[in-house]
Amino acid sequence: MSAPDSITVTVADHNGVAVLSIGGEIDLITAAALEEAIGEVVADNPTALVIDLSAVEFLGSVGLKILAATSEKIGQSVKFGVVARGSVTRRPIHLMGLDKTFRLFSTLHDALTGVRGGRIDR
């Protein structure tokens, strides 16, 4: 998938769960690449979608908007979770209250377990 230099998007299937791993910066310049990647994955009608922001270095307001729009678009038809840790990603998601809109996880392992309906040990 072609993307601007300041973002990387990797799509993988983890036993039926679509995982988008994002790296770099999510801003006005890279937003279209992220929206395109999410659109392609959602078009395949996955049962669950995890967006992994572990390698994101900057999460602008447009990225928060994309996450909220994705959650709204897929509704209850697709289980949805976001991996965010650290102040770059987790803090803005929490401050905007988006952690009440979609499930937020600290690790990919927890996200995969969570969207599959499993128990997450803390």
From Swiss-Prot:
CDD domains: STAS_anti-anti-sigma_factors. Changing S61E: No longer interacts with RsbW. Pfam families: STAS. Putative phosphorylation on Ser-61 may prevent interaction with RsbW. The keyword DNA repair does not apply. GO terms for molecular function: anti-sigma factor antagonist activity. Keywords: Phosphoprotein, Transcription, Transcription regulation. Positive regulator of sigma-F (SigF) activity. Binds to anti-sigma-F factor RsbW (UsfX) preventing its binding to SigF, thus activating transcription. Interacts with anti-sigma-F factor RsbW (UsfX). Its phosphorylation may prevent this interaction. NCBIfam families: ant_ant_sig. This is Anti-sigma-F factor antagonist RsfB. It comes from Mycobacterium tuberculosis (strain ATCC 25618 / H37Rv).
